[in-house]
Amino acid sequence: MRYLTAGESHGPSLTAIIEGIPAGLKLSAKDINEDLKRRQGGYGRGNRMKIETDQVIISSGVRHGKTLGSPITLTVTNKDHSKWLDIMSVEDIEERLKQKRRIKHPRPGHADLVGGIKYRFDDLRNALERSSARETTMRVAIGAIAKRILKEIGIEIANHIVVFGGKEITVPDKLTVQQIKVLSSQSQVAIVNPSFEQEIKDYIDSVKKAGDTIGGVVETIVGGVPVGLGSYVHWDRKLDAKIAQAVVSINAFKGVEFGLGFKSGFLKGSQVMDSISWTKDQGYIRQSNNLGGFEGGMTNGEPIIVRGVMKPIPTLYKPLMSVDIDTHEPYRATVERSDPTALPAAGVVMEAVVATVLVTEVLEKFSSDNMYELKEAVKLYRNYVDHF
C-alpha cells in the first residue's frame, strides 16, 4: 500500500491517491467522514472547524460499496477557499493583491522561514500553506480505510491523551482497547478518566485567554496484532521504526516511545523485560508489556502501545519576536488562525498513521488481491502461531 496527498491549506481542495487496497473491502464515504468529524472535534478547537465540516468524495477505486483493487482517489473540498480566491489563485494576479496576505514575519516553530529559504520564496505563505496541519485531513481519511481493513482481520485501535499541557492523566488499570475507545470518545478532551475533564477544560480556557498554547502526550493502543509483523533482518524493516517515523511525521510531534519507553533508561533489565509463558488456551504470552508489543522490531502478540509527544502549537495570539525578511528588522511574528490546543485531533491523526503503517505491513506479509484471500491468509497464519 502506498499513497500521496496533495493540496494547500486554503486551496480549493485536498486530494489523496491510494494504491494497493485489496478488492472486496466494504467502504463508503460515511466510513471516512466519521473519522474526519472526529479530527475536527475536541475542546479548544478554533473557528475554522466550524467553517470546514469535512466530507470526502470518493471518485475512483470503489463501486457499489466495495473496493475494486484499483487506485482509490479521495477529495475533500476546502469550504474556506471561497474567501481566498485571489490569494490562492493558480493564475498570476496583480502585485497589490499578492501583498494583501503576504507573510514576511516568520512564526517561530513553523516551517515559514526555513521553507522560504529552501525554496527561495519571498512570500512565506508558500511554505505555510502546504506545511499546515490541514494536510492531516487526508491522512485521517487514508487511515479510516486502513482501519476498515484492520477490523476485518481482527485488529482494533484506539487513542487517548495521557498528558495534557503538563498535567498527567491517571489511567485506570487493564482497560481494553474497546473500553479506551469508548471512554475517549465520550470525553471532549479525549481522556479516559472523567475526573480530570473539567480541570483540563478550565486549563485550556486559561491558556486561550493568555494567548498561549499547550501540547501533551498521545497514546495509541492496538490490540489483536499477529505475532511477527516487521523484521529484524534489516534496519528499515523494523516495524516499530516505521511506526516511529510515521508518528513524528505528524505536525508538531517531537518524540515517540513504546511501552515503558524512556523510563526504561532508569530501570534494570530484570524490571523491563517481559517474561514469557505458555498456556494451552493462549499459547505464548508475556507476563507484562513493558516493551509495548515489540521485540527485535517485530510484533510479539501483545498490544502495541505507542506514545507521541506533541509540542504546543507554534502560532500564538500573543506572538513571539521574529524578523522582517525584507528589512531584517525585529518584528512580531505573523498571527494566523490558531487553537490553544489540538491534542484530541492529534490523537485521531496518530491513530490514522499507525493504522496505515500496520496495514501496509499486513499487506506485505499476506500479499492478497482481495479481502477474502487476505482474511484466509491471516486466519491460517494465526492458526500456525497458536500451534507453534
From Swiss-Prot:
FMN binds at R130, S131, S132, N251, A252, G296, K311, P312, I313, P314, T315, R337. The keyword Cell division does not apply. Reduced FMN (FMNH(2)). This is Chorismate synthase. NADP(+) binds at R39, R45. This reaction introduces a second double bond into the aromatic ring system. One of its GO terms (molecular function) is chorismate synthase activity. Homotetramer.
